[in-house]
Amino acid sequence: MKPPVRVAITGAAGHVSYSLIFRIAAGHMLGKDQPVILQLLEIPQAMDVLKGVVLELEDCAFPLLHGLVCSDDVHVAFKDADYAILVGARPRGPGMERSDLIQANGPIFTTQGEALSAEANPEVKVLVVGNPANTNALILLKNAPYINPRNITAMMRLDHNRALFQVAKKMGCHCSDVEKMVVWGNHSASQFPDISYAEIAGEKVAKGVENNWHGDNLIPIIQQRGAAVIKARGASSAASAASAAIDHMRNWVLGSGGKWVSMGVYSRGNSYGLDEDIMFSLPVICEDGDWREVAGLELSSFQRAMLEATEAELQAEREAVADII
């Protein structure tokens, strides 16, 4: 059996992590032959709840779980981490604007970036889940000088998975049959779910749907899906977010099998003329523990306008935290 790897998880007593941690311990993320040591971080006032999660983890007797670390100290939780999934973030409170939320999360991700850079494996792979994920990831990146910017990512896989299902539902097929789906930009209502390249069995999806379905149906459904979940269940997406995090990390580590996936990545060197200092969701292919951009796709004027709109939002978010990056 392989030697165990260390997986750090922040916000470990929260709803998303409750759906995430047990799946990682069961081998769903890194494979059935990869033992893990879970390093769980929480704020002091949630440590008692985290103890309950640990009791349940112990009671599962997972063969792949080779150790547990629980702490409210980032330096302890991130020590020698090979993977870090940053779920914890300041939630949006009543009357808070998005800009307020971004600024409130700034100190959290500044501290975590510094600690990861100091304590983690230098090749640590980082996924930021806590919202606003793209700009939180940018803050982290700017405060983690010893981590390769390519190894810091923001989660767009939930949006990607949502789009796969909606396209499959429309086309009467299984979501695993849909290929070359792309979600561009920010994890927000400005994101751009794009079917321009999507295929099912080699046939273009765009040819099989009404001309207005993409703009009038798919795009708003995906952009507002998170709000629809909150309205229906009275809480934000948890199990689906955890599943998306598993998918993101599994493909990044083990490969995406040649398939396109959407990942929020540092935009430096991108082939689409985008601002080179934001965390922007691009189509990528994962192989050999790395990702590469699907470069040079042809863009229509509509696509370009959609990319520019979400790019502008990310630029505004960056400006809101300019003093800490």
UniProtKB/Swiss-Prot annotation:
List of residues binding NAD(+):
G11, A12, A13, G14, H15, V16, S17, N105, Q112, V129, G130, N131
Quote the Pfam families the UniProt record gives.
Ldh_1_C, Ldh_1_N
User: What name has this protein been given in UniProt?
Assistant: Malate dehydrogenase
Q: Residues that bind substrate, according to the entry?
A: R92, R98, N131, R162
Sorted alphabetically, which keywords does the UniProt record give?
NAD, Oxidoreductase, Tricarboxylic acid cycle
Positions of the catalytic residues = H187
* UniProt entry tagged with the keyword NAD: yes
SUPFAM superfamilies per record: LDH C-terminal domain-like, NAD(P)-binding Rossmann-fold domains
Under CDD domains, the record lists: MDH_chloroplast-like
Gene symbol? mdh
Q: What is its EC number?
A: 1.1.1.37
Its recorded reaction(s) are: (S)-malate + NAD(+) = oxaloacetate + NADH + H(+)
- Molecular function in Gene Ontology: L-malate dehydrogenase (NAD+) activity
Q: Has UniProt tagged this entry with the keyword Oxidoreductase?
A: yes
Family as reported in the entry's similarity comment: Belongs to the LDH/MDH superfamily. MDH type 2 family.
Enzyme's top EC category: oxidoreductase
What's one GO BP annotation on this UniProt entry?
tricarboxylic acid cycle
